[in-house]
Amino acid sequence: MEKEADNKFRWVIKNFSSLGSERVFSDIFVVGSCKWRLMAYPKGVRDNRCFSLFLVVTDFKTLPCDWKRHTRLRLNVVNQLSEELSILKETQMWFDQKTPAWGFLAMLPLTELKAENGGFLVNEEVKIVVEVDVVEALGKLEESEEATQPLKKVKLEAFVESKGLLKETSSVKEEIIDVNVFHVLPSQVEFVSRVFERYPEIASIFQAKKQHLRTACMYVLLSLIETLCKSLEELSNDDLVGGDNALQYLKFSGFKVDWLEKKLEEVKEKKKEEQIGETRMQEMKVFKQKCSDIEALMEREKSKLLVTRGSPLTLDDVL
């Protein structure tokens, strides 16, 4: 991992075509007192046939429960033949205990990435530049020291995804319960059971055999439903973008989520109406203030007019 600036790093994935791991990780780097690293899926996630790329907070389990980082993220897959052809994607989001990872499932199609003389895969190397700007920080963290580790496949006790983005759990094993061959936490059993009771066919064509992929999909599903249950005041545009990413991931994974897609569209429409309503209210407040100013002006003019008119002249006044 080559540091180009305080918030800018370059990651070179070597021997790209011969990588056997489903996912690979960059070295760890530090920005905003958090330890981060990039995570890539060189073969894509399931059947989406795209190069997937995410930014992950590596030590989120050891951070205070109230930590948050509002982050501006720029991910650039470098075209080594022409900088103008590089693929750049940008987003802003809040990283926190529930969402310690964010990125793009479809950074670019694998056919484009691997194209001969395409410029992205040169000498079996793919180069990625990441820029991380911490816009706002909540929760006090201990100052982290920069650390690095070799690129490798990491063995995890669990691997989950939230809002379309993957996150790692710590190596500490938690109690888990099997619900329809999906491993969930005890606090999630009732909720997950209700989902399967209401929509028994939701995972009928889901074929992932590895438990960490099943867990990932279930956490995406729960996170999306949690987002849809937020009040419009709490719901942000970033939440809606994350909802779209989560829905895309679930559909790619083989989940039947037409009902969720419909609900998400309804919520997006309501959020749009709310924003339009807020804009109109603001305009009306301005108009009301103008009317109030005009009314006050009219009262002053009325007073002047009464003074001007005064009492009619008497005969004595005339003579």
Swiss-Prot record:
SUPFAM superfamilies in UniProt: TRAF domain-like (SSF49599)
Lineage top rank: taxon: Eukaryota
Keyword Iron-sulfur found: no
Keywords per UniProt: Coiled coil
Domain MATH span(s) in chain numbering: 6-132
UniProt feature coiled coil, ranges: 255-302
Organism ancestry: Eukaryota, Viridiplantae, Streptophyta, Embryophyta, Tracheophyta
PANTHER family: TRAF-LIKE SUPERFAMILY PROTEIN
Name of the molecule in the record: MATH domain and coiled-coil domain-containing protein At3g58200
One Pfam family named in its UniProt record: MATH_2
